[in-house]
């Protein structure tokens, strides 16, 4: 199929698990439809951007848009821009780029190391645009609006306050 990708099985597993995160008032047919759309959007993104890799949590960002009254093509168009600019750094094959802190700001890197703060303490917040920790839909949409209208590092800035 034109939507084959090495991460297809992981995408399907994650999307199937996210069914319990959907609003309770949705009918099972609507849930199935949203999950099918979610898989198609994610695979289209991965096939379109062959240099990028799927990460667990990307489906949560896409789901935020699919739950709005947007169709699948509009959701893909939004995500197509986001994966190129706002969340691109999350889509590389490894976290090697995070080591650039040592090169670019050794004083900050030294402080973080001394504080014994693991780099991943807020990683899921940033990777999912807070969808795992912000349970109120209106609050999540407000954060999403902020992230769309701001510098791509805004999710990190929010994590610091």
Where do the protein language model's features map onto the residues?
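Helix-rich, well-folded core regions that mediate interactions or catalysis
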Residues: 1-161
